[in-house]
Amino acid sequence: MSKHKLEYIWLDGYKPSQSLRGKTMVVEDFSGKLEDVKQWSFDGSSTEQATGDDSDCLLQPVHVIPDPDRFGGNGWLVMCEVLNPDGTPHESNGRALIDDDDDDFWFGFEQEYTLIDTETNLPLGFPKNGYPDPQGPFYTSVGARVTKGRDLVDEHLHLCLEAGLNVEGINAEVMMG
C-alpha cells in the first residue's frame, strides 16, 4: 500500500496582502473524502497569525481535490480555514464570515500573473534593453510574435481542470509576460 501526501493550504495573516502557505501530511491510506481529512495545527507566529508565546493555530479542512501534478496519483490538495486553538475562526479567516446557507450571491475571480524570465528578471518577452511595444497587440493575442509562455499557461489550465477546479477560461493580458 502506498502512502498519500495531503498538502494543507491556507492563507497567512500578512497585511495588506495574504499569501498562500502549505505543509504536507503523509498518511497510510486516504479515501479522497473531506470527512477523512484530519484537522492539523501549525506555528502561527511564523505566519503573522499568533505570538511566539502562544503560537498554535488550527487548520480546518474545507475542500479536498486530487493533485494531478505531484506524487503519482497519491497527492491531494487540502484547502483549509485557519482557526484559533479554541476552534473559533481566526481573525485572518475572511471565509468564516460567509454564511453557508446564503446561496443568493455568486462570485468569480480572475487569476492574473506575469511570467518572469529568470535570465533577465524581466517579464517574459520583454527586450533586454529598452522598452516593450505598446500594449495594444498583446491582449487576447495569438501567435509567437505577441504571445509568450503559452505552453506554461496551457499546462496550468490543464492541471487545474484535472484537479477538478472550475476554471472559466484563459486569455493573454495587455502586456508580454
Feature-to-residue mapping (PLM):
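Glycine-rich, acidic/polar active-site loops that bind/position phosphate-bearing ligands
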Residues: M1-G177
